[in-house]
Amino acid sequence: MKSYIAVDIGASSGRLMLGQQKRGQLTLKEVHRFSNGFAMKDGHDRWDVDHLIHEIFKGLEKVKKMGIKDVELGIDTWAVDYVLVGENGHKLEDPISYRDKRTHNAIQQLTSDLPKEYIYEKTGIQFQDFNTLYQLYKENHDLLAKTDKIMMMPDYLGYVLTGNAVTEITNASTTQMLNLRVGLFDKDLLGKVNVSQDQFPRLVESGSVLGNVSHKWHTQYDIPEVEVVTVATHDTASAVVGTPGEGDRWAFLSSGTWSLLGTELNVPENGLQAFHENYTNEWGAYGTYRFLKNIMGLWVAQCVRHELGDQYSFGELADLAQQVRPFQQFIDINDERFTNPENMIKELQDYCRETKQTIPETPGELFQAIYSNLSLFYANELNKLDRILGYHIDTLNIVGGGSNVALMNQLTSTLANIKVVAGPSEATAVGNIMVQMITSDEVENIGAGRRLIETSFDLKRYLPETNKYGDILKEYQRFLTNKSKEMV
């Protein structure tokens, strides 16, 4: 029986998950969990990548103690962040987080003489000020001059483990520098941010074998033999691989710190309508494109829970929210003001105060406001998706931590008038492992993999509740339209 390890690292935590196929079902077990987060250092919010590497090896030591002598391993992380590596093969500094404020106004500055339409036609990627393109635009020029290689976060971790450097395609696409037509980094855009093609390791597809963990690590840690596979290294790309894909015309919602809502396409959709709606065409595994919208997601809920002293579990907060009447206020949950405020509760309350709406005060009111407005935002985006694609999405597959929030799943189903399939909650780790299984020939292809996922995990299904909330979605859409007009 083969053993697979998914190293799945998010903005606030990471874990090592053990995957094995037993009696025709995929089993998943958490082996090791650790904290992650950025901290202010030398004037910027930075990641401690040395901590991440140490925790990966601590997890692998636990794997060996389980009696497992050799494993496959894949690494996925969040997107857009990178590590600058010098000619000596070591990082030049701790990498800066995408939530750092250095890229404020970077889009406006870079596009002052380079039209947005031109960039979108080339890359198909939505405009977000933390994209790698704008981070590099704001990067220290002296530091870039010393840089031998620019490595995306999961590629850097794989490089440290094996000594082999590559740039995996799904994460590379999120940089907003990968040319859709030629499948290479775009020279014009690279020139705009003073970097060269040679500074990026070679591009590889998901499922490429990277190599074995270097011998030196075996002298420092008591770990099994490990072969590293370059999986779909962007965590959302792995989550989409780990989506059951139920329905004839299905969409996915990867619901975690960020919410990524979209569908899987065989050809990119980078026309003017997609551009104006700020949809993105991120590259997926096995020749696909993830046509999606990036939404603030459960970050807002995570911040509020923390500001409440972490005294409630998310389950308890969902129960409290269930007791509160929904839609007492409309909130554009994707507003940039919620990206990294000093106090999220105050920011939500100020927003409601400024828009002359009911102010949420109690934990239940705050979480009802968050969940109901996320559901409204999802339903609104599903309507847009239908219009752009020219057909109706019939099923929404919700994966990730948000798939456990029954209140939000049911609201989304009702508001969007769509069937919702929730689960697996660990879709990112599942997708990470599935790519490894396909590479090792234990699973034939992505279709067979998704059938295995559907029969291996307990999925919950939600159907719309007829006429329950009247025209609330139209009222929300009018609110967003009026808000946009006020900002012009």
UniProtKB/Swiss-Prot annotation:
What top-level class of enzyme does the UniProt entry assign? transferase
Write the Enzyme Commission number(s) for this entry.
2.7.1.5
Q: In which pathway does it act?
A: Carbohydrate degradation; L-rhamnose degradation; glycerone phosphate from L-rhamnose: step 2/3
* InterPro entries listed in its UniProt record: ATPase_NBD (IPR043129), FGGY_C (IPR018485), FGGY_Carb_Kinase (IPR050406), FGGY_N (IPR018484), Rhamnulokinase (IPR013449)
Return the protein name: Rhamnulokinase
Which Pfam family, an example, fits this chain?
Answer: FGGY_N
Task: Tell me what reaction this enzyme catalyses.
Answer: L-rhamnulose + ATP = L-rhamnulose 1-phosphate + ADP + H(+)
Q: Which residues bind substrate?
A: 79, 234-236, 294
Ligand binding (ATP): 11-15, 257, 302, 401
Cofactor(s) demanded = Mg(2+)
What this chain does, per the entry, is described as:
Involved in the catabolism of L-rhamnose (6-deoxy-L-mannose). Catalyzes the transfer of the gamma-phosphate group from ATP to the 1-hydroxyl group of L-rhamnulose to yield L-rhamnulose 1-phosphate.
GO BP terms in the entry: rhamnose catabolic process
CDD domains named among the record's database cross-references: ASKHA_NBD_FGGY_RhaB-like (cd07771)
Give the matching SUPFAM superfamilies: Actin-like ATPase domain
From what superkingdom does this record's organism come? Bacteria
GO molecular function list: ATP binding; rhamnulokinase activity
Stated family: Belongs to the rhamnulokinase family.
Q: Where is the active site?
A: 235
Any idea which UniProt keywords this protein has? ATP-binding, Kinase, Magnesium, Nucleotide-binding, Rhamnose metabolism, Transferase
